[in-house]
């Protein structure tokens, strides 16, 4: 897992914006390529387990930024999540640091949760329509939305559901992984 501080002090707004634009561009390209690959794939829905994890076109990044009293960005932390096999490998501060706010890629959270633990959720499987390479498209959309939210300076997290066309929001990351996932799942059951 690659951790890299891009900005640690104030006065780095240009760098923050550059990183946001770069991610937005790369995720947009990933989205286009994912659609292209998706057209070549067939639907594969399993009754007992979710489809096997497929390679990604681009690594997924989580953007964090701390805020000063006047809410201006102070720092940016990029976490490359591509090597994560399960939540146990995630750094402790990822879900516990109350001083960090993020426009986080919740698509990746769901993806790694479902594929690493092979969770069977019949209702979610029907509503989200899991299929081969479908999650690649799903993640591309969520990455794009995360990049956009970071660009506009949002401190909330949004999950874009292409099949349901609604947003799930989470304003606090002080909870445990299970709490966050349970909130998301409960929202999906509505």
From Swiss-Prot:
It is found in: Membrane. Its main location: membrane. The chain crosses the membrane at residues 15-35, 58-78, 94-114, 148-168. One of its GO terms (cellular component) is membrane. Keywords: Membrane, Transmembrane, Transmembrane helix. It is a multi-pass membrane protein. It comes from the Eukaryota. Almost completely overlaps NOP13. This is Putative uncharacterized protein YNL174W. The lineage of its organism: Eukaryota, Fungi, Dikarya, Ascomycota, Saccharomycotina.
């Amino acid at each position: 897992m690659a951790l890299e501080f891009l900005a640690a002090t104030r006065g780095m707004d240009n760098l923050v914006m550059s990183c946001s634009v770069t991610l937005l561009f790369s995720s947009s390209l990933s989205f286009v390529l994912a659609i292209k690959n998706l057209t070549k794939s067939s639907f594969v829905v399993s009754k007992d387990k979710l489809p096997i994890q497929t390679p990604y076109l681009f690594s997924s990044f989580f953007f964090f930024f701390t805020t000063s009293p006047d809410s201006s960005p102070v720092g940016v932390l990029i976490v490359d999540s591509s090597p994560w096999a399960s939540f146990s490998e995630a750094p402790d501060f990822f879900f516990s640091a109350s001083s960090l706010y993020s426009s986080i890629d919740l698509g990746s959270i769901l993806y790694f949760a479902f594929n690493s633990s092979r969770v069977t959720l019949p209702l979610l499987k029907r509503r989200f329509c899991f299929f081969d390479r479908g999650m690649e498209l799903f993640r591309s959309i969520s990455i794009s939305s995360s990049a956009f939210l970071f660009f506009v300076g949002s401190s909330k997290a949004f999950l874009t559901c292409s099949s349901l066309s609604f947003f799930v929001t989470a304003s606090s990351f002080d909870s445990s992984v299970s709490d966050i996932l349970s909130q998301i799942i409960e929202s999906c059951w509505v």
